[in-house]
Structures are given as structure tokens and as C-alpha cells.
């Protein structure tokens, strides 16, 4: 007997949606100089975007183009990406601090046309933002979401034509959360969570079927208030708070799908996940805090003198630099507020060499190095996301 739930598998593509898919595909082909990559140029994937954007094709096309350029710049491409993600040099050093699913798509439900994803919430938010630059964490979340998408796309290639898009089901464990840490919406870790949520909702729409919050705090009203900061109204409707863990496998999901820790029958035996399938994180100490400007020392130079720029509300500042043949770039910056940051070749925002990311530098500066920019004009773009306040920017760019 199936578990009782309001959320079943995603509906198959309708005739009306097929017409929209053809229209959106044509718009994207016109906008993208290299066309749509084959892996994401499927009817089911474009259907996900159309459903997620509710007919706002202008916003859809803009975000799809930025997503593709950012994916390429981050190196999150290739048929084996799902297998190599956890080994990437930009990802591997931070995995010890993150407790997230290693189940891939193994816990699969035909009834839901979805697989299970399990994550444990941060236990040390104040230390976390001293250990990760905003871009470090966003790139991890970006890459992880892309890995899940690739698993979805593989499933969709094999399924029958009468099925809808594949999705995943989230169990999000709040056991280690002190909800009062999240009362201040302006805190650095609240902002980081907000930006993370914005990224997956913008670039990976309609991939999540349902979000089950387990081990919730007693202050449920405060929990809903916090959730509203992170999620769209549509994704808020996907949340189910599980106060009694026996309900998860009794009322909502089949017992064989749910880890034993959450009242089900499943016990993971595949490393590096624990019995729930989640990687085991270690405690962050002060020795783990990020040390800025090390990339200058590693290349044997002192940090050059910084430049300053005031960026008016909602305006962009673009700094251009010509990189000679055989040279590379080192850079860093801090900003007084939130900004959209990207690095691209010349004037072509579709040719990103660093992903377009919404960033903050509350605790740590942003910095990095670029090796693949020899003999190119490179543009650093800083967009002030505030409509009211001037952004005070301090930045350094060095050629070596």
C-alpha cells in the first residue's frame, strides 16, 4: 500500500507546454552563440524551467543563459561530472565541513518518479562563514545542484515518454540547529543561506518535489518565518514539518525509502555516507578559518595597492585589463553591500571565466586566480544590488 501524500510525481508535458517548449527553445537558440548544450536541451528539462518561471520567458531566457555561461566557467561540465564532482580541487577541501547526501540517485521511488536527498543543517553557522568565502560555498551548492541535475537527466533519458520530469525528495534534518541563531535576517550566515536558496531556485527550478523538515525546533512559528526568508511561495508549499519521525515513513513516504534514523527502514552501507547516506562532517575550529591573500604569497609577491570605487545604487562598474601572453591574473575585493560579480572576456558576458554570482563580503574578502586568460582583455563586473545605497568597493588585480 502506498504512503499517503499530496505530492506525487510531476505531471507529464501537456500539449500547451510543448508549444511553449518550442518557443523557448527558439528564443534560447537565438540568444546563445553556441546554442543549447545537448544535455540540457531536452523537452523535460525545458518544461521544468517553464513551470518554474510561470510564463516569464524573458526572465527564463536571461537566467538560463547566465546559468550556462557560469556552468562552463566553473568547469561543471562533462558526461562524468556526477562521478568527479566530489574530487574537484575547488570542492574537495570543503567537504569535511558539510553534511550532505552521498546517496546519488540510489534511493529511487517509481511512484514519485524521484530519488531521495538527505542533508543535515549547519551546526556552527558563525564559524562556517569564517571558513568559507561566499563564492566557495556558492560554488559547492552550484556544483552539487548540477550533479543532481545530471542524475535527473540520465534518469529521464531512460524513462518512458508518458512520464513527467524526474525530481528529488529532500529530508532536511534540523537537529543541530539553534533556531535563534537565525532570528536576524541581516546576519552573514542568514544572507549566505538566502543567496544559496536564490541560486538553486533561479538555476535549478522544479527539481525539488517535496521538502521534509525533521527534528524541528519547538518554535514552529519562528521556523516558518525563517523559511519565508529563503524560499519562494511555491517552494514554501512543498515543505512538510515532521514533528514525529514516525509520521515520515507512515504518512508521507514508503518506509523502505526513508532512512532508519528518520523512522524508516533504509540503512546505507555505501561509504563515505553514514547510515542515512550523509557524509560525516567534523567540527570547525579556529585553525580552519580562511586566511586571506595567500594566493599572492604562493606566487611570491606582496599584495599590490588596492583601488577604490563608489558604485551608485543599481549601477555597474566594469574594470578592464589586458593580460599579456603567458600571464595570469590574481585578484581580490571587498564590498560594503551585496553585489553581482562576474569576470568575462572582452565585452561578452556569455564568455565568463568566473561564474556570475551574488556575493557578500561581510566576514571574508573575495579572491582568486585565473590561469586561462592569457592574451585576452578581461572584464571584472561589479553590480550594486541595492537600489538605495552606494556600494563602496575596494579591489586589487595583479598580472603575474
UniProtKB/Swiss-Prot annotation:
One Gene Ontology cellular component annotation held by this UniProt entry: cytoplasm
Residue span(s) of domain GOLD: 304-399
Pfam family, one: CRAL_TRIO
PROSITE patterns xrefs: CRAL_TRIO, GOLD
All copies of domain CRAL-TRIO, residue ranges: 87-270
InterPro entries named among the record's database cross-references: CRAL-TRIO_dom, CRAL-TRIO_dom_sf, GOLD_dom, SEC14/CRAL-TRIO_domain
Top-level taxonomic group: Eukaryota
Protein name per UniProt: CRAL-TRIO domain-containing protein C34C12.6
Amino acid at each position: 500500500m502506498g504512503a499517503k501524500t499530496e505530492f506525487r510525481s510531476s505531471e507529464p508535458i501537456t500539449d500547451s507546454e510543448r508549444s511553449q517548449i518550442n518557443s523557448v527553445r527558439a528564443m534560447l537558440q537565438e540568444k546563445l552563440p553556441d546554442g543549447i548544450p545537448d544535455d540540457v536541451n531536452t523537452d523535460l528539462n525545458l518544461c521544468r524551467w517553464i513551470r518554474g518561471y510561470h510564463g516569464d520567458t524573458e526572465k527564463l531566457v536571461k537566467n538560463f543563459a547566465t546559468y550556462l555561461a557560469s556552468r562552463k566557467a566553473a568547469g561543471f561540465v562533462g558526461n562524468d561530472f556526477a562521478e568527479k564532482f566530489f574530487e574537484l580541487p575547488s570542492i574537495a577541501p570543503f567537504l569535511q565541513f558539510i553534511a550532505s547526501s552521498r546517496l546519488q540517485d540510489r534511493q529511487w521511488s517509481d511512484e514519485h518518479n524521484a530519488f531521495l536527498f538527505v542533508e543535515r543543517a549547519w551546526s556552527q553557522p558563525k564559524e562556517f562563514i569564517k571558513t568559507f568565502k561566499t563564492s566557495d560555498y556558492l560554488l559547492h551548492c552550484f556544483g552539487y545542484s548540477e550533479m543532481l541535475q545530471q542524475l535527473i537527466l540520465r534518469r529521464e533519458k531512460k524513462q518512458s515518454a508518458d512520464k513527467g520530469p524526474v525530481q528529488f525528495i529532500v529530508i532536511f534534518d534540523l537537529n543541530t540547529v539553534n533556531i535563534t541563531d537565525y532570528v536576524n535576517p541581516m546576519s552573514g550566515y542568514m544572507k549566505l543561506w538566502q543567496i544559496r536558496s536564490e541560486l538553486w531556485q533561479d538555476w535549478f527550478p522544479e527539481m525539488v518535489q517535496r521538502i521534509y523538515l525533521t527534528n524541528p525546533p519547538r518554535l514552529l512559528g519562528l521556523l516558518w518565518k525563517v523559511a519565508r526568508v529563503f524560499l519562494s511561495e511555491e517552494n514554501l508549499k512543498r515543505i512538510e514539518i515532521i514533528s514525529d519521525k514516525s509520521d515520515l515513513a507512515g504518512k508521507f513516504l514508503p518506509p523502505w525509502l526513508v532512512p532508519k534514523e528518520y523512522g524508516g527502514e533504509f540503512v546505507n552501507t555505501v561509504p563515505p555516507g553514514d547510515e542515512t547516506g550523509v557524509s560525516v562532517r567534523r567540527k570547525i575550529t579556529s585553525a580552519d578559518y580562511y586566511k586571506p591573500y595567500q594566493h599572492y604569497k604562493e606566487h611570491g609577491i606582496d599584495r599590490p595597492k588596492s583601488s577604490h570605487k563608489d558604485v551608485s545604487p543599481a549601477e555597474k562598474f566594469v574594470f578592464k585589463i589586458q593580460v599579456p601572453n603567458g600571464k595570469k591574473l590574481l585578484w581580490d575585493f571587498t564590498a560594503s553591500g551585496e553585489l553581482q560579480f562576474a569576470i568575462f572576456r572582452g565585452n561578452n558576458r556569455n564568455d565568463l571565466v568566473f561564474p556570475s554570482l551574488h556575493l557578500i563580503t561581510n566576514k571574508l574578502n573575495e579572491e582568486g586566480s585565473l590561469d586561462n586568460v592569457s592574451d585576452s582583455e578581461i572584464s571584472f563586473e561589479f553590480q550594486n544590488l541595492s537600489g538605495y545605497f552606494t556600494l563602496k568597493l575596494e579591489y586589487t588585480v595583479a598580472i603575474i
